[in-house]
UniProtKB/Swiss-Prot annotation:
The keyword Transcription applies. Homomers. Interacts with itself, danr, ey and dac to form a complex (or complexes) containing the RD factors. It comes from the Eukaryota. Residues 7-58 form the HTH psq-type domain. This is Protein distal antenna. The gene is dan. Residues 338-352, 445-460 have a biased composition (Polar residues). Residues 462-478 have a biased composition (Acidic residues). Keywords: Developmental protein, DNA-binding, Nucleus, Phosphoprotein, Transcription, Transcription regulation. Residues 34-54 bind DNA. Its main location: nucleus. GO terms for cellular component: nucleus. Probable transcription factor with a role in the retinal determination (RD) network. Regulates ato expression and is required for normal R8 induction and differentiation. Danr appears to repress Dan expression, but Dan is required for Danr expression anterior to the morphogenetic furrow (MF). Dan and Danr lie downstream of so and require dac function for highest levels of expression. Residues 227-242, 575-591 have a biased composition (Low complexity).
Length: 683
């Protein structure tokens, strides 16, 4: 700062560099007033305001002027905190060393070297070179972390000085936000220490071992050109100081790309960052990594060390044990090709005691062949915990448990299903058929059941003749005492009613695909002494009794169903009548009353479906509250709870209004009937 005196009696003129102006602006950003800063540097306050307006231009000029003057002395001055802060000691800003760097306001570019708090763990006490900066918290042996002993090519045997073509990709961090040079970056320590920190972390956390390959691109490229890597003994972690006393590289990471894995599997897997070599008898071909979620311990018994190394597998196993689902998981002794992964994995040949017991394979937990035999554990977890989402049935998790228990009681042999492109197994047991029949039964809508035109009724007569199974009719009608066997065309397919009482069976008719699909599992359901019959009773109880459907609704629905059947029969009898006037005169009254009953039935079934849907939603909400899936959040549960409550409250006034509507309709019907009778009497 040069002070020049102009004419007498005037304020001394100061020629300030752009850097000095930037520091004055920074003091204003830090909270000082413009007046105090202007008084401190001897500049009018209006001039200082002009500098603040042209701050960007001044910063550009400051960068242009300082890049040419970079030298070791300036670097040492910037690294020394005592001289880095401007002003006399009483005006210096107190900086708490424990606080992080202050990046507030418009702080950027070169003033970071002055405004920075001393980084924790680094020794800035003397003017040292960057390569000599030590870590205070570590022992003296860790001075091997400096740049002279740094290994940049992934070879731990030879120390190498960094050359521009071997510099780690972390060197691009020095160019953040337009920073030029190490002196003006917040990372005043060199990137060598950053790569060393990654190596140290990789030793402490084996999951980060692949990150140690950040600085081994040349070696990786050389290894990928060779079809078979050179066999070396497995490299161990070296001690920081050898017995002879001379310095060695402090901590080194195992070079997985050069090491032959201990495996009896038919291929050698060599893992680096993102490239995988698979050496087989045919020759080495490079395959792109497929990130597999499943753990890579298939092919051997899982050891405790490998279980701890894979956090996803550990979490899966803990959830499995907590819910008592070990019996649904397959044993890990299956032979399969090694898994391509982006992280190096141990494949241990000798068997150890498994940490968690596993039961033999069940058909429900068999992996499908389309999964490439590697996503076994993850696939089974999705199958057990996501069963309700897959089958749209809230009770299917209970079904899975029932299925496993009954299969264990029957001592069925292990059957591996290999062709499974679908989630459901192709070889369906009786339980799958029961679930399928319940799903198809619930999917029928009243609109399908209540077709009223003559053409549809005649079409359904033809389809009923084709589809109706006499064995099924005989079995179901055998359950209903006092009802004669009717195999005529008017007897449509019989489905269980919406009530838990098995003796009330309404008659309804469906379209052809529903009838065909739901007659297939009939022999499994109707067998009285089999496990399927017991499971059918359990399913009926779960689907209807637990739901707590109102006691008066089933009887109303049944009477409505019977009236609908009578309406269909009468309508079919009069469909062949060619005299339109006679049919209108004779059947006008009966047709009108039947249509009204049919409309009432549709309203009741609509309400019944709403109630059932709300109850299923409440069950699903209760299941979500008890499940341990990490993706389910409290906000989602609250939203679902409010949604169900809103639908529930909107349905309640409709239920109360409907009896009044029914009374009014009955009165109108009686009035119309009396009017017709009077007209007929006059004739």
């Amino acid at each position: 700062m040069n002070i020049r005196m102009g004419t007498k009696g005037k304020r001394p003129l100061r020629s300030l560099t752009p850097r000095d102006k930037i520091h004055a602006i920074q003091r204003i950003h830090d909270g000082e007033s413009k007046a105090s800063v202007a008084r401190d540097i001897g500049v009018p306050e209006s001039t200082l305001r002009g500098w603040c307006k042209n701050e960007d231009k001044l910063r550009f000029m400051s960068r242009q002027s300082t890049t040419d003057k970079m030298c070791a002395d300036a670097l040492a001055d910037k690294l020394d905190v005592s001289t880095g802060l401007l002003g006399p000691p009483e005006k210096r800003q107190r900086i708490d060393p424990s606080l992080p760097l202050n990046f507030s306001n418009k702080m950027k570019f070169d003033e970071l070297g002055f405004k920075r708090a001393p980084l924790n763990g680094l020794d800035y006490s003397t003017n040292k070179n960057i390569s000599e900066l030590n870590y205070n918290g570590l022992a003296v042996d860790y001075v091997g972390f400096n740049g002279q002993h740094k290994v940049f090519s992934g070879d731990i045997n030879r120390p190498a000085n960094p050359s521009p073509n071997a510099i780690s990709p972390l060197s691009s961090l020095t160019h953040l936000s337009g920073l030029t040079g190490l002196s003006q970056s917040p990372l005043a320590i060199s990137f060598n220490e950053l790569t060393t920190n990654l190596n140290l972390l990789a030793q402490l956390n084996p999951s980060l071992a692949a990150m140690s390959g950040l600085n081994s691109f040349p070696t990786t490229a050389n290894n990928l050109r060779n079809s078979k890597p050179s066999v070396q003994p497995p490299l161990q972690v070296q001690s920081p100081r050898s017995d002879s006393g001379d310095r060695t590289p402090g901590l080194s990471v195992k070079n997985w790309a050069k090491q032959k894995p201990l495996s009896a599997v038919s291929s050698d897997v060599s893992c680096s960052i993102n490239l995988t070599i698979k050496n087989e008898a045919k020759g080495g071909d490079i395959k792109s990594p497929s990130p597999s979620i499943a753990p890579s311990h298939v092919g051997s018994i899982i050891s405790l060390s490998n279980l701890a190394e894979d956090p996803l597998l550990y979490w899966l196993k803990s959830q499995q044990t907590m819910l008592g689902l070990n019996s649904l998981y397959p044993p890990m002794g299956m032979t399969s090709p090694p898994i391509r992964s982006s992280t190096p994995q141990h494949i241990i040949q000798h068997a150890q005691t498994p940490p968690l017991p596993s039961a033999p394979l069940t058909p429900s937990s068999t992996p499908s062949g389309s999964l490439d035999e590697k996503n076994v554990a993850w696939y089974n977890w999705c199958k057990v915990f996501g069963a309700s989402l897959n089958t749209l049935n809230p009770n299917s998790a209970t079904l899975a448990a029932l299925q496993a228990n009954s299969l264990q009681h029957q001592h069925q042999p292990i059957s591996a299903v290999s062709d499974g492109t679908d989630i459901a197994d192709t070889s369906k047991g009786p339980f799958d058929n029961i679930l399928y029949s319940h799903l198809t039964k619930e999917s029928e809508t009243p609109s399908v059941r209540s077709l009223s035109s003559n053409e549809h009724n005649q079409l359904d007569q033809i389809e009923g003749d084709e589809v109706t199974d006499p064995d099924l009719d005989a079995e179901i009608e055998g359950d209903v005492p006092g009802k004669p066997e009717d195999l005529s065309a008017s007897a449509k397919r019989i489905t269980p009613s919406q009530s838990p009482i098995a003796s009330l069976v309404p008659e309804s008719h469906t379209t052809e695909p529903c009838a065909k699909t739901s007659t297939t599992p009939s022999d499994c359901i109707s067998r009285p002494g089999s496990v399927g019959g017991d499971c059918k009773k359990i399913l009926d109880n779960m689907l209807y009794k637990i739901g707590g459907i109102k006691s008066h609704m089933p009887t109303i629905v049944d009477t409505a169903c019977e009236s609908e059947a009578s309406f269909i029969n009468e309508h079919n009898q009069h469909s062949n009548n060619n005299d339109i006037s006679a049919s209108n005169n004779n059947n006008n009254n009966s047709n009108k009353t039947d249509e009204e009953e049919k409309a009432k039935y549709l309203d009741l079934t609509g309400d019944n479906e709403d109630v059932k849907a709300i109850r299923h939603g409440e069950k699903f909400l209760q299941w979500l509250e008890n499940c341990s899936n990490p993706r389910v959040t409290a906000v989602q549960l609250m939203q679902l709870r409010f949604l169900i409550a809103a639908i529930k409250s909107s349905n309640e006034p409709q239920v109360t209004e409907k009896p009044n509507k029914d009374l009014l309709e009955n009165e109108e019907n009686t009035e119309e009937d009396s009017c017709r009778n009077k007209i007929r009497r006059r004739k």
